[in-house]
């Protein structure tokens, strides 16, 4: 059963856009970007997102005594990238009350705007004892108040 959401009731997501130029070492024998590189492009997007919205980068997690492993990753390939193509990576944080980080990604080819790939990832918080957190860590709640209430 679908929920009936009121228009405007969903908070706008935080987004960041970054780019990368495809290197020769990233293509396979078919001269297109090897499928595993798209996962790295997603990570490039998350890292750039963390620089734009400080406080949720990997080093921040470590400083607070947490890690945030990926527990789910979805990726759909739409069109190829080749050497020297510039990939535009849009990364969007999807706000959730659950103790996790949900990101969506869209990758376009700069030269023609073509959609290349899209996907999503889910990360959970794990404390220094190796336990998965059932509630958001305090630092993340503070980060959310800082950045998500500015929207």
Residue spans of the language-model regions?
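Terminal targeting signals and extreme-terminal segments of soluble enzymes
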Residues: 1-88, 94-102, 106-151
């Amino acid at each position: 059963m679908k929920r009936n959401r009121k228009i405007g009731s969903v908070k706008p997501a935080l987004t960041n856009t970054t780019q990368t130029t495809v290197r020769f070492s990233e293509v396979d024998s078919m001269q297109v970007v090897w499928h595993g590189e798209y996962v790295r492009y997603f990570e490039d997007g998350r890292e750039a997102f963390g620089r734009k919205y400080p406080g949720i980068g990997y080093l921040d997690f470590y400083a607070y005594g947490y890690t945030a492993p990926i527990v789910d990753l979805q990726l759909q390939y739409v069109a190829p990238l080749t050497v020297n193509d510039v990939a535009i990576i849009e990364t969007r944080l999807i706000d959730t009350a659950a103790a996790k980080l949900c990101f969506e990604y869209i990758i376009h080819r700069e030269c023609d705007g073509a959609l290349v790939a899209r996907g999503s990832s889910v990360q959970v918080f794990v404390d220094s004892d190796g336990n998965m957190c059932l509630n958001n860590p305090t630092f993340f709640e503070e980060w959310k108040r800082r950045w998500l209430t500015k929207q």
